[in-house]
Amino acid sequence: LSCYLGYKHSQTCPPGENVCFVKTWCDAFCSTRGERIVMGCAATCPTAKSGVHIACCSTDNCNIYTKWGSGR
């Protein structure tokens, strides 16, 4: 499985990590810089905390941050 780690940057996931994710949230600079974004591989879909959005998927490079487009 390959997942995006950032804009147009994809990497093969380590063994046992079969889920891609995109985690977004706002911090103090959200109004000027936009959402904070973490992308990557995981063994299971991370648990979202209040104010954090997480999207998970399980096909190659499926963890697209929609505001960037496909990244391809």
Curated annotation (Swiss-Prot):
Location within or outside the cell: Secreted
Cysteines engaged in disulfide bonds, as pairs? C3-C20, C13-C41, C26-C30, C45-C56, C57-C62
Sorted alphabetically, the Gene Ontology cellular component annotations on this record are: extracellular region
As one GO molecular function, the record gives: acetylcholine receptor inhibitor activity
Q: At what positions is Arginine amide found?
A: R72
Q: Which domain of life is it from?
A: Eukaryota
Q: Hey, what tissues is this thing expressed in?
A: Expressed by the venom gland.
Task: Give coiled-coil spans as residue ranges.
Answer: none
Q: What is its main location?
A: secreted
* Stored InterPro entries: Snake_3FTx, Snake_toxin-like_sf, Snake_toxin_con_site, Toxin_cobra-type
Q: Which UniProt keywords apply?
A: Acetylcholine receptor inhibiting toxin, Amidation, Disulfide bond, Ion channel impairing toxin, Neurotoxin, Postsynaptic neurotoxin, Secreted, Toxin
Name the Gene3D superfamilies for this protein.
CD59
Family the entry assigns: Belongs to the three-finger toxin family. Long-chain subfamily. Type II alpha-neurotoxin sub-subfamily.
What role does it play? Binds with high affinity to muscular (alpha-1/CHRNA1) and neuronal (alpha-7/CHRNA7) nicotinic acetylcholine receptor (nAChR) and inhibits acetylcholine from binding to the receptor, thereby impairing neuromuscular and neuronal transmission.
**Protein name as catalogued:** Alpha-elapitoxin-Ast2b
Organism for this UniProt entry: Hydrophis stokesii
